[in-house]
Amino acid sequence: MLRIADKTFESHLFTGTGKFAAPEVMVEAIRASGSQLVTLAMKRVDLRQHNDAILAPLLAAGVSLLPNTSGAKTAEEAVFAARLAREALGTHWLKLEIHPDARWLLPDPIETLKAAELLVCEGFVVLPYCGADPVLCKRLEEAGCAAVMPLGAPIGSNQGLETRAMLEIIIEQATVPVVVDAGIGVPSHAAQALEMGADAVLVNTAIAVADDPVTMARAFRMAVDAGLLARQAGPGARSTQAQATSPLTGFLEALA
């Protein structure tokens, strides 16, 4: 079980809602993934209408919604968007995203920390998307964020855990859940993240753009479960030298 703030999740796989060919495919993929927490870009839905083509099926599916501030370029814009989402959706949960450069979509660390401090004071459960910076993640944790969401690689790049060395430090020092977000391109990337100690992963593009999103969602579900189970089983230590699995000379001595 994974606990973040006031909610508990059985699934360690969070999913997004962007890039799907149709809302029906999105909902079917989310169900196949087993995900219980789904991010929702506020700029893509009509928050005033709960019969919105994206919002309505998500509400019907019974998943927890995590509105995000994607599109915000400053702390002020993010805080404004967060307040709108809370009023419209009735949730104080928020994925904080601030990326001023549309080409790279890298999170702005200064504006993110500034917004996080303000939103925590307003009672939001803040899950900030951030760079894989151990110092920043610790500062966000100290500011009161309920979890941290460092990137594995740039959003939508499918490059995998390019920031692995920094992620390991973040995981080791964190006292809040660590959710690896962005860059996860195939199920094995998700399994690796859970194996190394991440509490969850957030996957969107890899599922949404697959030839068969529903089957890919199911594959990610299995990979996350496998990665978590492997970590709980206690993997053997890595070694720079070969380690024999059976005696090398015993049978020769027996023949002497």
Swiss-Prot record:
Name this polypeptide is given: Thiazole synthase
This protein's UniProt keywords: Cytoplasm, Schiff base, Thiamine biosynthesis, Transferase
Free-text function comment from the UniProt entry: Catalyzes the rearrangement of 1-deoxy-D-xylulose 5-phosphate (DXP) to produce the thiazole phosphate moiety of thiamine. Sulfur is provided by the thiocarboxylate moiety of the carrier protein ThiS. In vitro, sulfur can be provided by H(2)S.
Originating species: Klebsiella pneumoniae (strain 342)
Active-site residue numbers: 95 (schiff-base intermediate with dxp)
This protein's pathway: Cofactor biosynthesis; thiamine diphosphate biosynthesis
Assembly behavior: Homotetramer. Forms heterodimers with either ThiH or ThiS.
Protein family (similarity comment): Belongs to the ThiG family.
